[in-house]
Amino acid sequence: MHNESTEHRIAELESRLAFQETTIEDLNAAITKHELELAKMREQLKIMVEKIKASQPSMIASQAEETPPPHY
């Protein structure tokens, strides 16, 4: 009877281990996918920021547009 109990416990542990290994593989795949998506989003954000900066005129006038100070 003790032998059956031990065998049952070992079988239960093996089953749990197999489930945990599958879960870890699934989580690893999800993290890898998310990392790729995040890298793409970062690149898209960088491009969008560059486009916004390029489309907005500067609030600082160029040297040629500036009027000389009054003491000149």
From Swiss-Prot:
InterPro entries hit by this protein: SlyX
- A Pfam family per the record: SlyX
The UniProt family comment states: Belongs to the SlyX family.
Protein name from the UniProt record = Protein SlyX
- Organism (species): Cronobacter sakazakii (strain ATCC BAA-894) (Enterobacter sakazakii)
Q: Which gene encodes it?
A: slyX
